[in-house]
Design a protein with these regions (language model features):
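C-terminal catalytic/motor cores of large multi-domain enzyme assemblies
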Residues: 3, 7-10, 25-230
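Major-groove DNA-recognition helix of helix-turn-helix-type DNA-binding domains
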Residues: 11-17
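Acidic Ca2+-chelating loop motifs
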Residues: 19-21
Length: 231
């Protein structure tokens, strides 16, 4: 029985030999599938997003940005620090979103009959789960985190989100959300605002594309960024 509890197996479902369930029977039984603790949250999120798409008057502002210089800087930075302090390009977008939300506080907060500006930036990050759903845990006080700290928080949230082990407090609405696509994916992302927030930043894939520099056509690493805002 102790072995069955450890493996998450219902003893009553096992075949007994002479009315005795053996350890071999327990060990050969398939393990119970891990519980996805975010399942209820994902269902609630789906309902909330459907309502948001119907009720929030979205408008979109789109800009394509040359990332070549930023990526060159990031490669040099990562080469100069220890492996544990290296960061992914995605963290540059998170940091940029934090800076932008600080400079434009009208996009950083919640709407409930009227707008409530947030005292800091609690950055929501859209994360795909292993079961195919989407959750948006938040990084509290992101305005106080440097790139290395942001990277640490992001890695931890993504790991636990995929394992279904996020805390309820981490799944509370942030003050603004960033949703990004993996490199090699679609060019742009037009997101749906996560209520009660009033804005969402969608990051497309970074790829080499034609660009004009000083009147000359060149190849640069660019990304299309889309701001979804509540009109």
């Amino acid at each position: 029985r102790r072995l069955a509890r450890q493996r998450g197996i219902d003893v009553a479902a096992l075949t007994a030999t002479n009315d005795i369930v053996t350890g071999a029977a327990v060990e050969s039984a398939p393990k119970r599938a891990p519980v996805d603790r975010t399942a209820a949250m994902r269902a609630a999120t789906a309902e909330l997003m459907a309502r948001a798409a119907r009720e929030i008057p979205h408008y979109y502002v789109v800009s394509t940005i040359d990332m070549t210089g930023a990526l060159d800087w990031l490669r040099e930075r990562n080469a100069a620090v220890k492996p544990r302090d290296r960061v992914l390009p995605a963290v540059l977008f998170l940091r940029a979103a934090v800076v932008a939300a600080t400079k434009v506080p009208d996009l950083n907060g919640h709407w409930d009959d009227h707008f409530h500006p947030a005292p800091g930036v609690d950055l929501g990050v859209a994360v795909a789960t292993r079961s195919g759903g989407l959750v948006t845990p938040r990084i509290v006080g992101a305005q106080d985190l440097d790139l290395t700290a942001l990277m640490g928080q992001l890695s931890d949230l993504v790991k636990r989100a995929k394992a279904g082990r996020l805390k309820a407090s981490e799944l509370q609405p942030g003050s603004i959300t960033v949703s990004s696509l993996a490199d090699g994916g679609p060019d742009a992302l037009y997101g749906v605002i996560y209520p009660p927030q009033v804005a969402l930043l969608g990051i497309g894939s970074v790829a080499q594309r034609p660009w004009v520099v000083d009147g000359e056509a060149v190849v640069r690493s660019t990304v299309t960024v889309t701001l979804a805002a509540d009109h």
